[in-house]
């Protein structure tokens, strides 16, 4: 029978999404999602009608609970703003309500090695309470120490189909050697054994009675009846018991190429009590020489019920319901292994290796090794895989409640080096014994949780875990809460967070009027301009108890001011450097402009030699606005004016090299300059580039010191290159190249023409059709005469 590795690889790739979703630790509880339709995590802080809605609307929002904080006509929603804005508007710091998320470490035993790996503390802290404000992340520090000699449980799961006959002989002598090698890295190790073949129905196994009793090819061989999974030996530290039980095993047989290994893996992970797993590092060694059946294959044998994910071992250790349930999916296997904290090691032959390599990508913290044809290298393969798995630390979480997001940063090599963020897990590779690695776990909630949630973090393959108690901060803790407060019109409402909550039938900011007075003309007159007939509250609010309660960003006695109508700079109100009040930007210190777009600094306006804008302009927004006739960033240029380089060229040359037009009176003509030689590299375009009369190239930089003296930093002279020879040779070479090109082009065109004509001639020759014909004047010398009597004699007589 021929294996189908490529088909299985394709199936594995298609099931990747399923396994990645399924292979999470089971949830400890589900939380119901609750959302406030007024809230959004996007944008900046916006006004909100209450303290609770304010702190939920955006993580940057704060609430001012000071009494009478809002101005006349200003909505109470304006109490909700950024901390800086509220302080700028006069809210005392002690009156700010700005709850922040926090974390509290409840249990933090220090990391320790323990005695021979037993009792080691490898993960810290152990329990943390985290309170999340929606939209605000909280970061946890999780430390892991790789302890020496951590205990190990190893379960050897072997394919006993007939093709594994040679391997079984080798495994019968494996127990002692495997224990000895494992005891080199840990002082507490136990091993167990299980085997598998396939489901005992067609087309996987022959159901002919004689074949069910003896499925091997020849009668002389020792052979057992086929089975799905058989748990042979529970985990033990007795190597002789392992070798004795394995020695009693014999191979079996099946029909098709893939084996029923998934059934065996699932039962070994689910039946923890029967297998005898301890709460230590758990390894499952899976050996086979072929691929595996997966979910859906059972339908070929009339098995339609999906695997139920429960243990079904009978008293003899056999999987008793293998013919009732289909094979498990990759996702089910990955989830069961992850939930049981088991690390699988797939030891397979070269023919099946590509399939199991793809499978390993879908199962967290698994390893694959190539098994020799007779399993002679299985001990070394197990040791290599164990060392690889134990040196890889993978931090993973249980299922998250709706609305909570998590990300990881891994700090593997030191405090300065952090790996990139990952959404699903944190991982450090090649962790040495006694080395401590750190993970930064960031938690963020988008909305409130109806109840606390327990989140579990653990390092795969290790028994310890960190329990995180997740709470959400969804209300204000105002200390001024007062029922029937005197501030609210002598007890007509309750005071909470600086705002009156009126009793039934009462209205107004201070509950000062009743519902019956709501439409009184006298009250409405207070919401219009004197002798005005326009809409109440300028159409930007509603009239309540004779006062305007403005909506949105409007304010003022009649809501006449719009605090969102100020000019914007780069799309931001007041450029982000001021506060908009009644259509006018009130800029922060050192900012000017209608949209606070200008900085008060003038550094960019000071020229090296001419002061502010070279004396030919004024500085506005840290940029020079030049007078008529001048231009340039510093107003230092004009039509017909010399550039700074031209003005100072002669002084730079005579001061540095004692040459040039001013060489004889340099000290007098250049008294206002200070020339120095500079060996610094030329970093920008501010350097002047000039030549002396003898073609010497030099550079200099014009600067201005604090005393108003012009400083010229001159680089040493550089001999100008003579390009005459290069120009002449280039011209000659160009002419020659053009001539050769023309000749070659002509010859090429002639060649193409000749080839085309010759090809046409050959084609015409092939189409000639010479016909053979006779001369019409020619008469043959042969005459043929037919005897009619001869023809009658040949005819039969009737």
From Swiss-Prot:
Mg(2+) binds at residues 161, 163, 259. Residues 150-389 form the VWFA domain. Ca(2+) 2 binds at residues 198, 254, 256, 258-259. It is found in: Cell membrane. Induction: Induced by TGFB1. Ca(2+) 1 binds at residues 163, 166-167, 289, 373. The chain crosses the membrane at residues 724-746. Expressed in a variety of leukocyte lines. Residues 478-512, 513-560, 561-597, 598-636 form the I-EGF domain. Residues 98-124 are annotated as: Disordered. Residues 1-19 form the signal peptide. GO terms for biological process: cell adhesion; cell adhesion mediated by integrin; cell-cell adhesion; cell-matrix adhesion; cell-matrix adhesion involved in ameboidal cell migration; heterotypic cell-cell adhesion; immune response in gut-associated lymphoid tissue; integrin-mediated signaling pathway. Residues 44-92 form the PSI domain. Residues 747-798 are cytoplasmic. GO terms for cellular component: cell surface; extracellular exosome; focal adhesion; integrin alpha4-beta7 complex; integrin complex; membrane; plasma membrane; receptor complex. Disulfide bonds join 51-476, 54-80, 64-91, 216-223, 271-311, 412-428, 448-474, 478-497, 488-500, 502-511, 513-545, 527-543, 537-548, 550-559, 561-582, 566-580, 574-585, 587-596, 598-621, 605-619, 613-624, 626-635, 638-641, 645-688, 651-670, 654-666. Gene3D superfamilies: Cytochrome c1, transmembrane anchor, C-terminal, Laminin, ligand-binding face of the semaphorins, domain 2, ntegrin, alpha v. Chain A, domain 3, von Willebrand factor, type A domain. Glycans are attached at residues 68, 279, 434, 477, 531, 590, 665, 674. The VWFA domain (or beta I domain) contains three cation-binding sites: the ligand-associated metal ion-binding site (LIMBS or SyMBS), the metal ion-dependent adhesion site (MIDAS), and the adjacent MIDAS site (ADMIDAS). This domain is also part of the ligand-binding site. The MIDAS site is required for both rolling and adhesion. The ADMIDAS site is required for rolling and mediates the negative regulatory effects of higher Ca(2+) concentration on ligand binding. The LIMBS site is required for adhesion and mediates the positive regulatory effects of low Ca(2+) concentrations on ligand binding. Heterodimer of an alpha and a beta subunit. ITGB7/beta-7 associates with either ITGA4/alpha-4 or ITGAE/alpha-E. Integrin ITGA4/ITGB7 interacts with MADCAM1. Integrin ITGA4/ITGB7 interacts with VCAM1 and fibronectin. Interacts with FLNA (via filamin repeats 4, 9, 12, 17, 19, 21, and 23). (Microbial infection) May interact with HIV-1 gp120. Belongs to the integrin beta chain family. This is Integrin beta-7.
